[in-house]
Amino acid sequence: PLYNHRLYSGFGRGDFFEAKELDKGIVRLKTLYEKVPPIGSIFISKGEYLFNRQSPAFRVFKSKNLLFKQINVHHAGAMGLIAERSADITLDGFNVVLREGSDRGVTTTADATHFCNCKGEITIRNCTFENMLDDATNIHGTYARVKKVINDNQIAYETYHPHQKDYLFGEKGDSVQIVDQKTLM
């Protein structure tokens, strides 16, 4: 059965569990919550923030005209596929699924698929995404803060989200759009 996991989840609150192994396979978790999950519940952890997205099944960077066909990802310690600064990608039968007969509860510890700063067409067809700990897909660009306007053609920028560490935001020849942080206009 599915339970109201929000009653027991610390996502977004910065709560961490203190864990102590009492016996082989028996762990006591101390929490601030008044309610505890029902006996028999399965505890699933994504791992420590900023260290839980380091092992995608596939990483694509600066590539184009790709076809991922009839691929099954059964587990990854991050996304099933992350594509950055690439173009024209087709997923046809790219499945993020539990292996048949597996007793695992999780496929990927993040999104099944993630496309960042890609261009052209991204096609997803005949795919199944299940049991991941985040979204089926994310397709987006990237925001960065303008730190300084150098001249009419140059800016200095800074990234601010922890997942953007060492991220290649732009290159010579790229065009950027300046928007207001509050209105995105």
Please place each PLM-identified region on the residue numbering.
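Residues that flank catalytic or metal-binding motifs in active/ligand-binding sites
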Residues: 87, 109, 133
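Glycine-centered loop/turn positions within well-structured domains
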Residues: 79, 89, 135
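Polyanion-binding and phosphate-handling cores
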Residues: 114-125, 130, 139
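Extracellular polysaccharide-degrading/modifying enzymes targeting complex plant/algal/animal polysaccharides
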Residues: 1-74, 99-105, 130-185
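All-beta strand scaffolds that present successive hydrophobic residues in beta-strands
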Residues: 44-45, 65-70, 88-94, 121-127
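Extracellular beta-strand-rich solenoid/capping regions of secreted or surface-exposed proteins
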Residues: 52-63, 78-86, 113-117
